[in-house]
């Protein structure tokens, strides 16, 4: 046989020394392929010779990706060695250009990772010739859609193995068992039940957080070297039967299994959400393309706060430490939507997340400069605006935050608009900050995107954000401060600000007849707001508290921190 690859398929069919099979060989299914083998009913060795070449022998044709049969989102380079998913999280099934041999390692290098999705590569084999498969007939997912058809076997690679730069090798042995190896680690049993009587093509689904892969030169594994210790330990009853139970284990690959870094944890109550469904939900909350240059700053407050995964993940190692504050590595841009995902929640109870912006460059601060509570940041001399996400948060939730040209910070929660949360001065550089509270112990920056104002469906402006009357204008300036931000324990002390330049003075709510007179003073929380601070024009104090604050040393506005030159009492017209 030598290296003549064309003789490989004839090996299992042309061996006269083997006994005939107990089932017909000429039956075809609706796709034109053979029916699944029922060899699991017989507990003896398979009665065929798998296509195994002598040691060191590989086909002359290199192993490449099939140039035509691929998912609609796949982009392939001219060498047919590298593929990339251009958008979404699915429609990225690929095949090898030729059948692989028994014990031939299919070696892949992960070249691109996109952390906003759940799940990773799906790897396996098929006995169907990809040249006879129309690309339009390929389903979105290898698991469970493709593996539910005869002649396809695949399983999900655990997420902790799907890091950029990792080299994954997988192969099938003569007993239909599939093994994999990550880099130079030990050989692990992946799944079993592959029918080796027919030629097998490699199947690679560039799914979920795996965005791009590259095929490396294949190698043969010597059978004598395949004695992984983990095989005996991992051989569960569900792996003893080779056909039906393999189907079951492959279908279960669609379940959401938490990774080592705690990402994509399933909800605490009820059944785990399948990754396909979870990603479909996320795709409604995320744009097709995300920029990945935004990271967390190295500065963090809290002895147990860690910045991980190329500075995209902030984790609190011990939930008892409430001093958990992190910043973005650069100022956010106007109209740039920042997407953040809650990737770990420490219990069934919902947690809380503070967010805000500051004009203070984190690079000029030390951890000791930061207060114990994020809401106490407003006592610093720089501009800080902080509040908490309204409503409960759970693992898997995605938040979108954007500061528009008017200085309004809008929030979306899983694609649903939550309205304007803060008013800030968009003319200055603004770093975003996050504070983790309670059971929220890990967040991840998924990326960012700049969309046109009318092109942000997940972040529509609330009615209060486009005021046309003095009453509406007063609502815009006071709602984020006194209503929305009061969802946190000290939220009212961490309000937002309108632009504090002189040109913003005409927009200050100084007109009688405002609709928010029932709002409480941010100092005493007893009397209604009835005082305008000069020169910034903010209304957040009662007259008595305003007088006391004005007499204080270095008196400044609680919102924008500008010096207080005077206070003006206002009266409501009857």
UniProtKB/Swiss-Prot annotation:
Annotated stretches, region: Disordered: 1-41, 491-511
Gene Ontology BP term (one): positive regulation of apoptotic process
Tissue expression remark: Expressed in brain, testis, pituitary gland, pancreas and bone marrow. Also poorly expressed in malignant astrocytomas and several neuroectodermal tumor cell lines. Weakly expressed in medulloblastoma (MB) compared with normal cerebellar tissues.
This protein's GO CC annotations: apical dendrite; dendritic spine; glutamatergic synapse; perikaryon; perinuclear region of cytoplasm; plasma membrane; postsynaptic density
Membrane topology, from the record: Peripheral membrane protein
Enzyme class, spelled out: transferase
Catalytic activity, EC: 2.3.2.27
InterPro entries: B30.2/SPRY_sf, Neuralized, NHR_dom, Znf_RING, Znf_RING/FYVE/PHD
Domain NHR positions: 61-217, 292-447
MF (Gene Ontology): translation regulator activity; ubiquitin protein ligase activity; ubiquitin-protein transferase activity; zinc ion binding
Catalytic reaction(s) noted: S-ubiquitinyl-[E2 ubiquitin-conjugating enzyme]-L-cysteine + [acceptor protein]-L-lysine = [E2 ubiquitin-conjugating enzyme]-L-cysteine + N(6)-ubiquitinyl-[acceptor protein]-L-lysine
Record PROSITE patterns: NHR (PS51065), ZF_RING_2 (PS50089)
Annotated protein name in UniProt: E3 ubiquitin-protein ligase NEURL1
Organism lineage string: Eukaryota, Metazoa, Chordata, Craniata, Vertebrata
């Amino acid at each position: 046989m030598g290296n003549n690859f064309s003789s490989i398929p004839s090996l299992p069919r042309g061996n006269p020394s083997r006994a005939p099979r107990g089932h017909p060989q000429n039956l075809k299914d609706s796709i034109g392929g053979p029916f699944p083998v029922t060899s699991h009913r017989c507990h003896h060795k398979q009665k065929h010779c798998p296509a195994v070449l002598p040691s060191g022998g590989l086909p002359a044709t290199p192993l490449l990706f099939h140039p035509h049969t691929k998912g609609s989102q796949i982009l392939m380079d001219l060498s047919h060695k590298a593929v990339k998913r251009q958008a979404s999280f699915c429609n990225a099934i690929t095949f090898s250009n030729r059948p692989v041999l028994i014990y031939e390692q299919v070696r892949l290098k992960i070249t691109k990772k996109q952390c906003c999705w759940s799940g990773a590569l799906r790897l396996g084999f098929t006995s169907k010739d990809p040249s006879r498969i129309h690309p339009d007939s390929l389903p979105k997912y290898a698991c469970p859609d493709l593996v539910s058809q005869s002649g396809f076997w695949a399983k999900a690679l655990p997420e902790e193995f799907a890091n950029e730069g990792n080299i994954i090798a997988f192969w099938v042995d003569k007993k239909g068992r599939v093994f994999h190896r990550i880099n130079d680690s030990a050989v692990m049993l992946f799944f079993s039940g592959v029918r080796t009587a027919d030629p097998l093509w490699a199947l690679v689904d560039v799914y979920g957080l795996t965005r791009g892969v590259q095929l490396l030169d294949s190698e043969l594994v010597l059978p004598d070297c395949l004695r992984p210790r983990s095989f005996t330990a991992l051989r569960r009853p569900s792996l003893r039967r080779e056909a039906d139970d393999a189907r079951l284990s492959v279908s279960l690959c669609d379940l959401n299994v938490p990774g080592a870094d705690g990402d994509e944890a399933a909800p605490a109550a009820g059944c785990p959400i399948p990754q396909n469904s979870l990603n479909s939900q996320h795709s409604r909350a995320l744009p097709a393309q995300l920029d990945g240059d935004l990271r967390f700053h190295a500065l963090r407050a809290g002895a147990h706060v860690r910045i991980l995964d190329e500075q995209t993940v902030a984790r609190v190692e011990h939930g008892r430490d409430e001093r958990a504050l992190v910043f973005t590595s650069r100022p956010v841009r106007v109209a740039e939507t920042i997407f953040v995902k809650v990737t770990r929640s420490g219990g069934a109870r919902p947690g809380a997340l503070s967010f805000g912006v500051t004009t203070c460059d984190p690079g000029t601060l030390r951890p000791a400069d930061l207060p114990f509570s994020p809401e106490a940041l407003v006592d610093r001399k720089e501009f800080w605006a902080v509040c908490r996400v309204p409503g409960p948060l759970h693992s898997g939730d995605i938040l979108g935050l954007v500061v528009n040209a008017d200085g309004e910070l809008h929030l979306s929660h899983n694609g649903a608009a939550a309205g304007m949360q803060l008013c800030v001065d968009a003319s200055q550089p603004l770093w975003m900050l996050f504070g983790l509270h309670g059971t929220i112990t890990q967040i991840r920056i998924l990326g960012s995107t700049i969309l046109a104002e009318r092109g942000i469906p997940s972040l529509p402006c609330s009615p209060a954000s486009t005021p046309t009357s003095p009453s509406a204008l007063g609502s815009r300036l006071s709602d984020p401060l006194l209503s929305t931000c009061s969802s946190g324990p000290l939220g009212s002390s961490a309000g937002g600000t309108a632009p504090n330049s002189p040109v913003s003075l005409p927009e200050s709510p100084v007109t009688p007849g405002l609709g928010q007179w029932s709002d409480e003073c941010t100092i005493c929380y007893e009397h209604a707001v009835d005082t305008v601070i000069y020169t910034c024009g903010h209304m957040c104090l009662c007259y008595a508290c305003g007088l006391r604050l004005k007499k204080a040393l270095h008196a400044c506005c609680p919102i924008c921190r500008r010096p207080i030159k005077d206070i003006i009492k206002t009266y409501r017209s009857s």
